[in-house]
Design a protein with these regions (language model features):
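A structural motif
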Residues: 72-92
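Activation targets extended, charge/polar-rich intrinsically disordered C-terminal tails
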Residues: 91-172
Length: 172
């Protein structure tokens, strides 16, 4: 499991610019089910919530992969934390994803990413109050020696949204 954060530096009381998303890479020899989608060995899927898309407000799969594939500089100040998951942790992530198909100012991408990450990881992160990508990025960067700057974002599958997942027409 990877937790990605990106933000634009601003001198404002609350910086809401940026995005937070997760990724799961299948490092096994068999297909894995993540959020109801089957991913093949050696491939990855990204997950995040979005409220600024006319097709759906809530859970999205692979839109971040799509964005970075077609616009490599789409996300600035990108950082990530990474955790190797066992079967029980993957089940906990899937349970969290089943409840995550929503978006609001308080249940935004930062709140979503932190909630799922904190479900399975002992290194807890804090998205702030209100939850923002910049606050979560600062929390990630406080995990000294554990975060990576400018990590690669995998692109293996088409874009889906919702739970259960539906193929996106906008990103087809």
């Amino acid at each position: 499991l990877r937790l990605y954060t990106t933000y634009v530096e601003k001198d404002t009381p609350v910086n809401i610019d940026g995005h937070v998303f997760l990724a799961v890479t299948n490092n096994t020899d068999a297909d894995l089910v993540v959020g109801g989608l089957s991913i093949a060995p050696g491939t990855s899927i990204t997950m995040g919530t979005r409220g600024n898309n006319r097709e759906h407000a809530g859970l999205w799969y692979n839109v971040e992969s799509y964005n970075t594939h077609y616009l490599p500089d789409f996300y600035v100040n990108l950082t990530c934390l990474q955790l190797s998951m066992n079967t029980e942790q993957l089940a906990a992530v899937n349970a969290a994803l089943a409840k995550a198909d929503k978006w609001s100012a308080w249940h935004n991408c930062a709140a979503f990413g932190a909630a799922v990450w904190n479900t399975v990881c002992t290194d807890k992160v804090d998205p702030g109050t209100p939850p923002t990508p910049a606050s979560l990025a600062a929390s990630v960067r406080s995990c000294t020696g554990k975060w990576n700057a400018d990590p690669a974002v995998p692109f293996d599958y088409v874009v889906y949204y919702g739970y259960p997942a539906v193929p996106s027409k906008e990103f087809a």
